[in-house]
Amino acid sequence: VVVQPLEHGMIDRLNGQDCLYHVNLQGKENGKPVDTTTRIDVISRALNPYTQFEAFMALSEQPDMRFVISNTTEAGIAFDATCKFTDRPASSYPGRLVQLLFHRYQYFNGAHDKGMIIMPCELIFLNGHRLKECIYQYIELWKEDFGNDYEGFKEWFTADCYVCATLVDRIVPGFPRENIDEIQHKICYKDNLVVKAENFHLWVIEKAENMTVAQLQEEFPAHKAGLHVLITDNEKPYHMRKVTLLNGPHTVLSPVAFLGGINIVRDACEHPLVGKYIRKVQFDELMQTLDLPEEELNKFATDVLERFENPFVDHQLTSIMLNAFPKFETRDLPGLKIYLERKGSLPQGLVMGLSAIITYYKGGKRQDETPILPKDDPKIIEKLEELWSTGDTRKVAEGVLAFDYVWHEDLNKTIPGLTDMVKEYLDLIQTKGMLEALQSIL
């Protein structure tokens, strides 16, 4: 059963197609193109809790209902103190979930085997921990509404419901407008809800505190279906792996490749110089900062490169460049610091990437006359304009690295040698061009 998170959405269209739709997976696997279309027929019905509140609450009365899986966006897991228990429904997702759970608790008289396994997929680090906090906040907020059932319900939720933290990893562009006619011809009817996604998928599920990994594997045996679902007792290393080996290289390859005359990620990976640079950053630098088994990291990094080289997706470098400084701060700076600590030297590839970001924010035009149009927080744009207006790369390097608004520290002082290396690379890019500057570190 699908429950719509917002008052207005796609429920009517989904029900209008008898809850049937297709998923078109495209990408590379073992170096070969993959393009499959599969009909999804596992949804029995779709509900709008704003217009079908009774039907929504009745879901909790089904004895075999065991899992709640959500994806309400990052803003969805939030506590709203204005929500009332008597709202039909509560305006927030955690509030609606508590309404559902309390009804189930009462309907089954607090039966221990009627708890729910809850798996949020929102892109928040340790999303399950945050959701659990919100649930407890609502339990306290609505304490008087629960009356004599307050203590019992709270104990039942704590002991018999299982809130997991998860990490989802799959690029889903959505409705394939560019080739929908071809897909509809292939499936022989008009599906207006086709979803396009890459073939790669990974779902890491951190078991709830009150259960074991073995218990969750038994209840949710996704591996038997051949799905890449990893059940663990700690999601953090996998979160760090994704941020470090997928998002990290993305952030630095984009300015380097764009300034080198390239426009899409796939072409960057296939470029003899930029492709070599990406592998240097990924395998020689960022991978060295993680503490998972080397074989596992190599496999993940290789999969990431296949994803970057997806022949079906033209991923524009300029779209990745949006908010590049905050992205570098969260995705690459931690690895730069760990690399320096472990190796005793600065990672040239990451520093070159940072220097390319700084150069990108100078604006202007590429050699082929393509405009360079940085997009970021106005404070960051203004700061870079001010620094570049000096015409002094030493002042640019020092000013950027001292910019507390981005780094929350003065990198000139906290990372020895970084200022000089950034200045050196800025000079190289200005005088030799991006590709020749890149050649100097490969």
Regions found by a protein language model. Name each.
Residues 1-442:
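Substrate/ligand-engaging "lid" and interaction regions
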